[in-house]
Amino acid sequence: MTIFQGRATRKPSGGKLRPNHSKRRYELGREPTLTRLGDRELRKIRSYGGNSKFALLRCDYANVYNPKDKTTRKVKINTVKENSADPHYVQRNIMNRGTVISTELGDARITSRPGQDGVINAVLL
C-alpha cells in the first residue's frame, strides 16, 4: 500500500472537498526507516529531481560531539536508553532524531535524521 501525502478529501467540518487534480507522484510518501542497532547497512533512495538520500538501516557507531571541549569523536553505541517518538522503540533498539543513546563517552542525544541522512550525529548530555 502506498503512502499518500496530498490534501485530504474532507474539510474539518466534515464536508467533502472536490479534488483539483488526481494523485501525483510527488505526493507519494514512503514507509519509515526504522534504524536499528547493528552492523552498518545503507539503502540508497531516489528522491525528487533525481537526487539521492541514504537511509541508514543499521548502525553501531555515532559521531558524538562534546560541547565542553568542542571535539567530535566516532564512538560505539551501546544501547538505546530513551526514545520520545515511541517507548517501544527502546526495547527494539530503534534510533531516530531525538533518541537518547548510551555510548562509550556517556549518554548522547541524536541530532541527525538517520533515515534520511545516512549517518548518526549526536551531542553529549
From Swiss-Prot:
Keywords: Ribonucleoprotein, Ribosomal protein. One of its GO terms (biological process) is translation. One of its GO terms (molecular function) is structural constituent of ribosome. CDD domains: Ribosomal_S8e. GO terms for cellular component: ribonucleoprotein complex; ribosome. Coiled coil: none annotated. It comes from the Archaea. The keyword Ribosomal protein applies. Disulfide bonds: none annotated. The keyword Ribosomal protein applies. Residues 1-30 are annotated as: Disordered. Transmembrane segments: none annotated. Part of the 30S ribosomal subunit. Belongs to the eukaryotic ribosomal protein eS8 family. NCBIfam families: eS8. This is Small ribosomal subunit protein eS8. It comes from Picrophilus torridus (strain ATCC 700027 / DSM 9790 / JCM 10055 / NBRC 100828 / KAW 2/3). The lineage of its organism: Archaea, Methanobacteriati, Thermoplasmatota, Thermoplasmata, Thermoplasmatales.
